[in-house]
Amino acid sequence: MESANASTPAKTIDQLCKECNLSMHSLQILCVFCRKTLSTAEVYAFQYKSLYIVWRGQFPFAACACCLEIQGKINQFRHFDFAGFAVTVEEDTKQSILDVLIRCYLCHKPLCEVEKLRHILQKARFIKLNSSWKGRCFHCWSSCMENILP
């Protein structure tokens, strides 16, 4: 499945579908890590999370939900820089916390303003992994907090 425009290969699922004249529902794309075919829900989730496809040879790959979470955990251990509250993020980036692109460190979804504000109100730290700020989305927040709640 080669991109129609070889000089600039598609970066997103949406672009790939347009170039190949496919619907997202009918797209068959493999996970770059485990090589399994993503389910329809995973294809839509990948697009919703604003993640980029990767090209290996002439073929596009995405990442399944399980591998995204595993990679998130691996990144925590391998690339942890430091943790800090919202003020630290703002000092580090010289931007308002609401303007900084912060992704969930498990599912990789960009955090919305409400999710960032939850970190502030709950006095939860953001973590810097491999020079990028990460936090927890609503979905992953509960699964992250289950282990520390009585």
Curated annotation (Swiss-Prot):
GO CC terms: host cell cytoplasm; host cell nucleus
Keywords: Activator, DNA-binding, Early protein, Host cytoplasm, Host nucleus, Host-virus interaction, Inhibition of host innate immune response by virus, Metal-binding, Modulation of host cell apoptosis by virus, Transcription, Transcription regulation, Viral immunoevasion, Zinc, Zinc-finger
Database matches in InterPro entries: E6, E6_sf
Subcellular location: Host cytoplasm; Host nucleus
Subunit structure: Forms homodimers. Interacts with ubiquitin-protein ligase UBE3A/E6-AP; this interaction stimulates UBE3A ubiquitin activity. Interacts with host TP53 and EP300; this interaction inhibits TP53 activity.
Lineage: Viruses, Monodnaviria, Shotokuvirae, Cossaviricota, Papovaviricetes
Listed transmembrane segments: none
Biological function: Plays a major role in the induction and maintenance of cellular transformation. E6 associates with host UBE3A/E6-AP ubiquitin-protein ligase and modulates its activity. Sequesters tumor suppressor TP53 in the host cytoplasm and modulates its activity by interacting with host EP300 that results in the reduction of TP53 acetylation and activation. In turn, apoptosis induced by DNA damage is inhibited. E6 also protects host keratinocytes from apoptosis by mediating the degradation of host BAK1. May also inhibit host immune response.
GO molecular function: DNA binding; zinc ion binding
ZnF (unnamed) intervals: 31-67, 104-140
Other notes: Belongs to the low risk human alphapapillomavirus family. The cancer-causing human papillomavirus E6 protein has a unique carboxy terminal PDZ domain containing substrate but low risk E6s do not possess this domain.
Protein name per Swiss-Prot or TrEMBL: Protein E6
A Gene Ontology biological process term: symbiont-mediated perturbation of host ubiquitin-like protein modification
Protein family: Belongs to the papillomaviridae E6 protein family.
Domain of life: Viruses
